[in-house]
Each structure stands twice: as C-alpha cells, then as structure tokens.
Amino acid sequence: MSTSPTISFIGAGNMASAIIGGMLDSGFKAANIWVSAPDDNHLQSIRKQFGVSVTTDNRYCAEQADMVVLAVKPQVMASVCSDIAPVVQNTRPLMVSIAAGLEASTLDEWLGGGLPLVRVMPNTPS
C-alpha cells in the first residue's frame, strides 16, 4: 500500500510554480499539494492553474504536510521559519529549502532544530 505524501509550498513564485507543474505533469495528485503566500489574488490564480489547495496562512499550510518546501526569498526566510517553527516542531515534516545562499545550519536554527532538512538548488530554463 502506497499513498502519496502531502506536500506544502510556502511561497508561490516562479520556482514553486515550475516545481508544482512538473509534479502534476508526472502524475502527482493536485489534491496532495498545498500552497501558501501572502497575496490571495495570486493564490487564486495558482489554484485555478493547478487545482491545488491554497491559503494565506503559512502555519496552516505547513500543518497539512508530510513535506514542506520553503520557496520564499532568502530575505524573508527567517521570518517565515520562525512563524512555522512551532507547527513543524510538532508535526515533524521533511523540510526542503530552495532558497539560495542559506546554510542548512541556519535554517535548522530558525526552525527550532532537529528536523529532517534538505537544501536543493533547482534550475529552470531561461
């Protein structure tokens, strides 16, 4: 028996959209994807484009997930991490960061420590 994990994206920019599109193209179910961002109008566009669940509440988004993809700009990462830290410390999802220039040890500290954490550097064609 294999079930798809629920993956939440904190951040809904170009890179998150590209990853979501690729996941859906490869057969991942939209019902297992959550996306959060501060701009509800942009989120509604993402919902219409991909059929995923959306929210402006980062904590709620993180709470839904088996895996959380941190897809925000490096300059807001500390704030986002401290906001969701109480939730992810409780639920213990796999944390994945696609932000450039931030060390895993820094992310680990901001998230409260001890979570499974992966840094990746995705690249999309120009």
Predicted features and spans:
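NAD(P)+-binding Rossmann beta1-loop-alpha1 motif at the extreme N-terminus of oxidoreductases
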Residues: 1-56, 60-63
